[in-house]
Amino acid sequence: MADFNEYKGVWVFCEQRQGALMSTDFELVSEARKLADELGCEVTGLLLGDNVEGIAKELGGYGADKVLVCESPLLKDYTTDAYAKVVCDMVNEYKPEVLLIGATNIGRDLGPRCAARLHTGLTADATHLDIDTAKYIDFLKESSTIDLSKQKFDMEDRNLKMTRPAFGGHLMATIICPRFR
């Protein structure tokens, strides 16, 4: 099992087309901000393309602390192999504990490939995201002066809970990947 203490931060794969960010990017960055606040870490956008550095600053207004920009003429338009390689290389180098990818056509192509290459889980069509902090509830009740952003927790307890519809939408399933980040 990996040392989860190496993993830090919530990342969002930011999708652009013809040099413009997609609306899902802003939604995901806002959701990432909530998760990062709970984890006490930063939100990082990952933006791939060609001549896209100028649009990266737009993500800050939605909660991104920083944006990593990977520019190349080869990344101007989405291609599965190129984008999967760059995303996986960046994740392996920087080790975010959460990576969010939108449920767009590109996201549905890229997400499973990255999950397989990174040997981690993937939940498609999640409708709710949360951090499993159950072990800390009693601790927090005992002390109302605790600033969560300054606390160090056992990383194995910081699981992302992903909720999605199951069985034709008649049931909601909550999924965690406790052995992977």
Regions found by a protein language model. Give the residues of each.
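N-terminal glycine-rich FAD/FM-binding segment characteristic of electron-transfer flavoproteins
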Residues: 1-181
